[in-house]
């Protein structure tokens, strides 16, 4: 497909070539382990092109997988896309593809908690050194790069506290010291389209497709879209690690992407309205929504992102007691308590300052009030605000 089209058009038409759709609107759902060859010559041809979208063996993918991979590459401008069973698998296998014993990794100190645990447990067991940096470090990232630094891992915005790093400055400073460093980003919040990672000289853009790509909280999948420099190594290492996703999940993810454009617009509109309302409430100390000036790195968001999604957090003026947490959290009518996000439904979680400090031992944010994370779904926004208002009344 021609890349001159707007994203909203591309979401609809990419990954729907006749080879994938066989004449139907959607790509076919092809479930297969064994894929049949008509002749020795056919088998030889498939073997030679097994990494290039040729049907070879189920673990390499079927037409269903190829259609989604084509769509993802079109979306994010990559040379290739690998599919994983969840977002964490995409993160961990992307890192593992480029490190060995004795190497060094630079990891955001505000990254997703399981990503940090992977570094502290698995990578350290492999005798790979980790240095955690403050996502607001900017050009000083250069001072942390060592001769054996192989991977620089970014996340934008940061998990829970929502900082937006100065990504172009960080990338430029890192490349100046080590042009060959592999730079990857957890790009889930932007759905890979609100921030175009590969256009900012990042090598690999990773998503928990479980969230916005699927969009309905019913499938788990991870994606990693790589540039030409890193694609072959990422693909082969991930394949050797046995990473794959079933055809049904790939099919459902591609179907979810068809409505991604309209969903992101609604997430943005509703979340900003809720965030602005929260910023005016006496119970709220600070709102950490990248689109609001109160969020650290807001100026970088305005410069580098084309829009926002539905996830943000806000700090209360007080640390809630255990009794207050229950009163506040247990009685919402529209907000549900759950991990993950990115679906059509609104979600809420509460973290205490000491809990944030525990999962962020390498950076300090000096939170004093309870930190509430919300994902704003597609309910009527005034009714969501009323639900939050009732929550504040319960802890008054």
UniProtKB/Swiss-Prot annotation:
GO terms for biological process: L-cysteine catabolic process to pyruvate; methionine biosynthetic process; transsulfuration. Keywords: Amino-acid biosynthesis, Cytoplasm, Lyase, Methionine biosynthesis, Pyridoxal phosphate. Its EC number is 4.4.1.13. It is found in: Cytoplasm. The keyword Lipoprotein does not apply. Pathway: Amino-acid biosynthesis; L-methionine biosynthesis via de novo pathway; L-homocysteine from L-cystathionine: step 1/1. Its cofactor is pyridoxal 5'-phosphate. PROSITE patterns: CYS_MET_METAB_PP (PS00868). It comes from the Bacteria. The keyword Lyase applies. One of its GO terms (molecular function) is cysteine-S-conjugate beta-lyase activity. One of its GO terms (cellular component) is cytoplasm. Its main location: cytoplasm. The modification N6-(pyridoxal phosphate)lysine is found at residue 211. InterPro entries: Cys/Met-Metab_PyrdxlP-dep_enz, Cys_b_lyase_bac, Cys_met_metab_PP, PyrdxlP-dep_Trfase, PyrdxlP-dep_Trfase_major, PyrdxlP-dep_Trfase_small. Belongs to the trans-sulfuration enzymes family. Catalyzes the cleavage of cystathionine to homocysteine, pyruvate and ammonia during methionine biosynthesis. Homotetramer. This is Cystathionine beta-lyase. It comes from Haemophilus influenzae (strain ATCC 51907 / DSM 11121 / KW20 / Rd). The gene is metC.
């Amino acid at each position: 497909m021609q890349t001159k089209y707007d994203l909203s058009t591309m979401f609809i038409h990419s990954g729907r070539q006749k080879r994938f759709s066989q004449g139907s609107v959607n790509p076919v759902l092809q479930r297969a382990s064994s894929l049949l060859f008509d002749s020795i010559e056919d088998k030889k041809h498939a073997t030679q092109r097994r990494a290039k979208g040729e049907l070879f063996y189920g673990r390499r993918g079927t037409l269903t997988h190829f259609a989604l991979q084509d769509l993802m590459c079109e979306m994010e401008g990559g040379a290739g896309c690998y599919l994983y069973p969840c977002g964490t698998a995409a993160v961990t296998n992307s890192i593992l593809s480029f490190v060995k014993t004795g190497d060094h990794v630079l990891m955001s100190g505000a990254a997703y908690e399981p990503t940090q645990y992977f570094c502290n447990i698995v990578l350290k067991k492999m005798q790979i050194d980790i240095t955690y940096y403050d996502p607001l470090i900017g050009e000083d990232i250069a001072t942390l790069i060592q001769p054996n630094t192989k991977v620089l891992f970014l996340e934008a915005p940061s998990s829970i506290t929502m900082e937006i790093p100065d990504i172009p400055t960080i990338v430029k400073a890192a490349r100046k010291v080590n042009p060959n460093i592999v730079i990857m980003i957890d790009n889930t919040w932007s759905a890979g389209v609100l921030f175009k990672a590969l256009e900012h000289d990042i090598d690999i853009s990773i998503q928990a497709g479980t969230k916005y790509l699927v969009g309905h909280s019913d499938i788990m999948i991870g994606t990693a879209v790589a540039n030409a420099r890193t694609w072959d190594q990422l693909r082969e290492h991930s394949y050797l690690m046995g990473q794959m996703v079933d055809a049904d999940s790939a099919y459902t993810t591609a179907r979810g992407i068809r409505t991604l454009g309209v969903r992101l617009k609604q997430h943005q509109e509703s979340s900003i309205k809720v965030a602005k309302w929260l910023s005016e409430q006496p119970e709220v100390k600070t709102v950490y929504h990248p689109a609001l000036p109160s969020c650290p790195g807001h100026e970088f968001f305005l410069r580098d992102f084309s829009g926002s999604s539905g996830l943000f957090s806000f700090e209360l003026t007080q640390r809630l007691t255990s009794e207050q947490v229950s009163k506040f959290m247990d009685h919402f009518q529209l907000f549900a308590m759950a991990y993950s996000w990115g679906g059509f439904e609104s979600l809420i979680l509460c973290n205490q300052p000491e809990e944030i400090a525990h999962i962020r031992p390498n950076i300090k944010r000096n939170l004093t009030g309870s930190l509430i994370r919300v994902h704003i779904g597609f309910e009527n926004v005034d009714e969501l605000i009323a639900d939050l208002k009732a929550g504040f009344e319960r802890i008054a």
